[in-house]
């Protein structure tokens, strides 16, 4: 909670001192823009009701006081008085050290290697218990993957899985697709060959940010699923070869898919994507779908390929992958912007039948946020 406040003589900002002794400065224009009163924000949905042009350019702090854990500010020249909860100000403080490491991950993310057990949650518990659902979604948000076990063994059950948190993203493959051996397949995923760890559909813009794979049959020998944390692989490259990391993050790769029925998809994005302030936000890695790299300067191409090769070596490192075999009624979700998935080759004896679909993280995060608010998380 705030303990005291001091407004600068210019009125352009104030300094808030909290009970723990920490201090944060807030600008007048920022406070006015983020006012929580019903004339500025809709009480129903929190959406802003004013534009930046509605706020006077010379907005300044006329008075500021702390009382009962809240900050009350009067703005000139409007003469408008607004109260801000101290907890809200603490959680939204921006007067912090912004000089963070390039290539860092979000504090909400936990990177991992082969020592990470595959988190597993029960289908019925997730459907019936909000806390179990919250824990399931939280694992996907933190780790980038999780299993769901004891589900129904029926076609299309993965659609029910997606509806627990969001919506299926339909593509040219349909609402969902089959993953099993085919004669003359249009995609290598439909063969019995092993697949290198990869992210799906890098040739789409934007890529589907979640993938669900649901097992209906799995009596074939082999065919274990493997997941690899792309963020951890990129961290290893960054620590070993910062210049190589910068090349993969600072130059776009190209990805392409030509399928049947007139489908031709292209995208131009970096293999390692950073936010403007340097946070790692996405990995795209799919050797099968890589198009010729034509956006890297001639003098950097060999170094780019060396970094690409090294990233692939980290991804293929057995110490990086978590493996498991899905049983009928089991499924797993991966964050397709972070976690790569692979498959060991399987024999022609027995049968292996999975169904897959795509979804997006906005629905997952929305459901998780609502559950956290309800459960006090």
Curated annotation (Swiss-Prot):
CC cofactor note: Binds 1 Fe(2+) ion per subunit.
Entry binding sites for 2-oxoglutarate: 198, 341, 343, 352
Residues spanning the membrane: none
Region called Disordered, residue ranges: 95-119
EC number: 1.14.11.72
Subunit composition and interactions: Homodimer.
Known function: Involved in the degradation of the naturally occurring organophosphonate 2-(trimethylammonio)ethylphosphonate (TMAEP). Catalyzes the hydroxylation of TMAEP to (R)-1-hydroxy-2-(trimethylammonio)ethylphosphonate (OH-TMAEP). Is highly specific for its N-trimethylated substrate. Cannot use gamma-butyrobetaine as substrate.
Domains: entry comment: Contains an N-terminal homodimerization domain, a short linker region and a C-terminal catalytic domain. The N-terminal domain may function in substrate binding by stabilizing the closed conformation. Does not possess the N-terminal Zn(II)-binding cysteine sequence motif found in gamma-butyrobetaine hydroxylases.
Name of this chain's protein: [2-(trimethylamino)ethyl]phosphonate dioxygenase
